[in-house]
Amino acid sequence: MIHQTETIAAIATAMNNSGIGIIRISGEDAFSIIHKIFKPAKEKDMQQVSSHTVHYGYIMDGDRIVDEVLVLIMKGPHTYTREDTVEIDCHGGMYVLNKTLELILKNGARAAEPGEFTKRAFLNGRIDLSQAEAVIDVINAENDFALKSAVTQLKGSVSEKIRKEREILLEQIAYIEAALDDPEHIEMEGYGETLLPILHDCRADIEELLNSADDGRIMKEGIKTVILGKPNVGKSSLLNALLGQDRAIVTDIAGTTRDALEESLRLNDVTLNIIDTAGIRSTEDIIEKIGVDKAKEYAKEADLIVFVADASRPLDDDDREIIEIIREKKVIALLNKQDLEIAADRKELKDLLGEIPLIETSIVENVGLDAFVQLIREMFYRKEINFNDQVYITNARQKSALAAAKAALAKAEESIAQGMSEDFFTIDLMDAYAQLGLVIGETVEDDLADEIFSKFCMGK
């Protein structure tokens, strides 16, 4: 357990040589520590200077200059942690950064744990848990959608919605408990009928947040994309073309890819997590059959399936089997090898695919790939994304808590509809209230908070 009375310090920038490095100090002794090791170019008492001011000078080890620095003084509670905070802008060499940090620790600070600065911001009430998790998402954002979604959550969009629902539930819980304590003066007859539409609206609002979770996950993590097709249709060539490098082995020998290959790439503002699978066909080879079974399993979990067919060969039962497997998923079909003599019946393929879009490609000649990438973007981002109005859940922990809250409300509604006493459905209301509290950290256990903040980088 972290002791908040201790002053903590850490290097806040990447742990490699760079032009500038930053060291952060937070806690009640931050100013006295910097006073001991910093010599301002113009003499002044660093414990008495105004807040949010920058000071030029030198980090000193006794009489020896360690580095020429800028020191930023920020007085709590108007800081990231709500504690007195110092940030030192040093030269970015790891030796000078570690030497400066060593002096700070020698003079009374403790080395911060991963995420401890943000944990203090949470414990001191500056941010809630959903906002703290958004800090990680901002750091890890790999595309513009992920960044905008994380920044929106960091500003408190999720927190605001959750607090609104909790206030509504708390008001109902308080009324019921007061009525149970004082039935002579507080009327409960017919209250269930009054409560039902309120709970229905709460559940609908939670449902709306839950419905955003898949879009939120895709924004944050990328589109889980599985390439399917029978052997030697160009699946590995497609992966290599998208990556711009030979990641997968490409030969004319069917069945070359037996183990799935996984890669992540960003195409403009679209992030794809691509899995190139073994070719699907009827086979007696035990090892190849395992690869085929794995490919079918990957298809079940995919956000997008890219079905690749070979224009130079007639369609066969293997193609038809794959189309049946993928029919209920989001699919883009590629009729590849357009540079060769065409043998596949395009009309038959279109009839089999139905509403599945088909693009004619020659991957080796880079034909059709631009249309393929554009179609992916349209399929997943065609609706206008308004980050001012729409809130996206991007976190599995938050999704789980919201689902539990929704289930508790549904149970309460069912109890009311069946004419159960207030004692029964009040328990469910309190459960829903607690589950919503988990989203923003109002009811979080210490162990869970420790686990969440341990995922942060050092110095954040």
Protein language model annotation of sequence segments:
Residues 288-312:
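Inter-motif core of Ras-like GTPase G domains
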Residues 274, 308, 334:
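Generic enzyme active-site microenvironment
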Residues 92, 242, 277, 309-312, ...:
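Glycine-rich, N-terminal phosphate-binding loop of Rossmann-like dinucleotide-binding domains
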Residues 59, 196, 305-319:
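Glycine-rich phosphate-binding loop used to anchor ATP phosphates in small-molecule kinases
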Residues 110, 271-273, 357:
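Conserved beta-strand segments of alpha/beta enzyme cores
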Residues 1-148, 152, 156, 332:
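A glycine-rich (often HGG/GG-containing) alpha/beta subdomain
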Residues 2-11, 15-18, 144-266, 283, ...:
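C-terminal-of-GTPase-core extension/linker across diverse P-loop GTPases
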Residues 55-67, 71-75, 255-283, 301-304:
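Switch I (G2) and immediately adjacent beta-strands of P-loop GTPase domains
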